[in-house]
Amino acid sequence: MSLYLHKSHNVNCIIYHIVCPTKYRRIIILKRIDQTIKNICLEITRRYDMHFLEIGTDKDHVHFLVQSVPMMLPKNIVQTIKSITAREVFKQNPEVKKQLWGGAFWTTGYFISTVGRAGSEMAVAKYVKNQGREKEYKKLHTDQITLFDGL
């Protein structure tokens, strides 16, 4: 669970759920790229007033759960994350640049939403953490028939 950030003139708890797709939705975020992105985000935390509460990767997009301060605009948070991660991924994994012929790692678009402190923060954190994993659906009734059982 996130903590309140105490600054000289305010106390806050602002959390954003950010989703950034790769350029052309290319499937390039494999194990090594996933680890590279997470390591880069640790460096971003050290240099900027933003804290990554959770990072979840799928093959063609990344979910970030980020806590920041009111002085940082949401678009600047996204811009910082996307620019630094792209530059460092290309530097540490030059073969990725060949797969993305336009020279950009991320698309220009993104999704961003605020996350409430109470119940939704844990729900979104769980969702972000489980990115890229197979969905586990619970079957309610073992004898339950489906629409196409007879076919």
Predicted features by range, described:
Residues M1-L151:
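Basic nucleic-acid-binding interfaces
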